[in-house]
């Protein structure tokens, strides 16, 4: 265990806990402003190794960052254009939704009545309103266009962060009373978070591609969208892969049938088994140093504090908190509670 950098007595701990509550309330209140900055910071952490690799090949840092950001902007434009097209196509196919779902409901009606549930298809049809879904999709398209400005500001922030990286060590050293120990702790946090995010991103990309290929092979509509969803939600520990499987399974169940939905379910189970339970633990190596319970609770906490982005980044944020606690006398015991002793 590292030697404590900060010494705290009992009274200071109580005072700091009170301050912590106030700070957390402030963060939650200002989440709309803070979340883009945090997201940009973690994107910069993912991209910085690529920039460093280009710099080692004697590419000027400004040029390396410019090339990387240009590629990302082009990819984002193509991705948003495709998503807009997919949502438009989904809007056009919505009238089929009501007719497709009525067939299984008609087959289900006698079974429900047989077990004592008195319900008619006409009553259920009253609650199936495709107009509500069309309104929802229209709002999504509007939000997608509005998100362009937010994405531009986010990428601009990432750009300046990547350009600022060489100056950060010197700035941090001037801020610290004990720069050697402090920089060691910061470097450890950066290495841990970077290791997790880079590997998690690689695994998520492969997961999304495999899900896309599986759905395309089964002739599922919007397979690319569901593959993209599998990529994004794979960052959420424990439940992300489950959430990613629900929309395509529901779509296939409504439009294709029960057996086709079972086939898609089996495909997702196989993907999660191979990547979530076999490949990812092997690639991650010794692990994150966090217990399984802490990973799940951090998902809830950061989701409450920062919203969906907090859920996506719950693990790296908790890693940073754990390393910070290890550098304080009063926080080392809390850091032990967060740890997985089997992986220490």
Curated annotation (Swiss-Prot):
List GO molecular-function terms, semicolon-separated.
Answer: efflux transmembrane transporter activity
Q: Which residues form the signal peptide?
A: none
Query: Which UniProt keywords are given for this protein, alphabetically ordered?
Result: Cell inner membrane, Cell membrane, Membrane, Quorum sensing, Transmembrane, Transmembrane helix, Transport
State whether keyword Transcription applies.
no
Q: Which residues lie on this side of the membrane: Periplasmic?
A: 26-30, 83-149, 218-221, 279-292
Superkingdom, natural source: Bacteria
Q: Name one GO cellular component term.
A: plasma membrane
Please list the residue ranges that the record places on the Cytoplasmic side of the membrane.
Answer: 1-4, 52-61, 171-196, 243-257, 314-344
The residues that cross the membrane are: 5-25, 31-51, 62-82, 150-170, 197-217, 222-242, 258-278, 293-313
Q: Does the entry feature the keyword S-adenosyl-L-methionine, yes or no?
A: no
Catalytic activity line of the entry? (2R,4S)-2-methyltetrahydrofuran-2,3,3,4-tetrol(in) = (2R,4S)-2-methyltetrahydrofuran-2,3,3,4-tetrol(out)
Topology relative to the lipid bilayer, per the entry, is:
Multi-pass membrane protein
Classification via Pfam families: AI-2E_transport
Record note on disruption phenotype: Cells have a decreased extracellular and increased intracellular concentration of AI-2. Deletion of tqsA results in a 7000-fold increase in biofilm thickness and 574-fold increase in biomass in flow cells. Deletion of tqsA increases cell motility by increasing transcription of flagellar genes. The tqsA deletion mutant shows higher resistance toward crystal violet, spectinomycin, streptomycin sulfate, 2,6-dichloroquinone-4-chloroimide, chloramphenicol and amoxicillin.
Give the UniProt subcellular location, in the record's own words. Cell inner membrane
Q: Which GO terms describe its biological process?
A: autoinducer AI-2 transmembrane transport; quorum sensing; transmembrane transport
The UniProt similarity line reads: Belongs to the autoinducer-2 exporter (AI-2E) (TC 2.A.86) family.
The task this protein performs is described as: Involved in the transport of the quorum-sensing signal autoinducer 2 (AI-2). Controls the transport of AI-2 either by enhancing its secretion or inhibiting its uptake and consequently represses biofilm formation and motility and affects the global gene expression in biofilms.
Instruction: From the Swiss-Prot or TrEMBL record, give the protein name.
Output: AI-2 transport protein TqsA
Organism annotation: Escherichia coli (strain K12)
Q: Report the gene name.
A: tqsA
């Amino acid at each position: 265990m590292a030697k404590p950098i900060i010494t705290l007595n009992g009274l200071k701990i109580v005072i700091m806990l009170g301050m912590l509550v106030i700070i957390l309330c402030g963060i939650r209140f200002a989440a709309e402003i803070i979340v883009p900055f945090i997201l940009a910071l973690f994107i910069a952490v993912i991209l910085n190794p690529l920039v460093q690799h280009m710099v080692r090949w004697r590419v000027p840092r400004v040029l390396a960052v410019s090339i990387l950001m240009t590629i990302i902007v082009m990819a984002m434009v193509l991705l948003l254009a495709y998503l807009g097209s997919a949502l438009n196509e989904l809007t056009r196919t919505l009238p089929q939704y009501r007719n497709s779902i009525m067939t299984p409901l008609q087959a289900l009606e006698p079974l429900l009545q047989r077990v004592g549930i008195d319900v008619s298809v006409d009553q259920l049809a009253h609650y199936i309103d495709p107009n509500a879904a069309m309104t929802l999709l229209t709002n999504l398209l509007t939000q997608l266009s509005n998100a362009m400005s937010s994405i531009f500001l986010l990428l601009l922030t990432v750009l300046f962060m990547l350009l600022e990286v060489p100056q950060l060590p010197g700035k941090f050293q001037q801020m610290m009373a004990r720069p050697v120990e402090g920089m060691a702790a910061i470097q450890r946090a950066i290495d841990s978070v970077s290791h997790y995010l880079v590997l998690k991103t690689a695994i998520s990309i492969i997961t999304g591609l495999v899900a896309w290929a599986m759905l395309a092979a089964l002739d599922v509509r919007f397979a690319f969208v569901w593959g993209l969803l599998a990529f994004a939600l794979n960052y959420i520990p424990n439940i992300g892969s489950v959430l990613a499987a629900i929309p395509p399974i529901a779509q296939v169940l409504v439009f294709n049938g029960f057996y086709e939905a079972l086939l898609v379910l089996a495909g997702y189970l196989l993907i999660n088994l191979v990547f979530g339970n076999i490949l990812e633990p092997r690639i991650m190596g010794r692990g994150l140093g966090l217990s399984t319970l802490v990973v799940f609770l951090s998902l809830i906490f950061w989701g409450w504090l920062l919203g969906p982005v907090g859920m996506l980044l719950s693990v790296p944020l908790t890693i940073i908190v754990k390393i910070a606690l290890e550098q304080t006398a009063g926080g080392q015991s809390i850091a032990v509670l967060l740890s997985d002793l089997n992986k220490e």
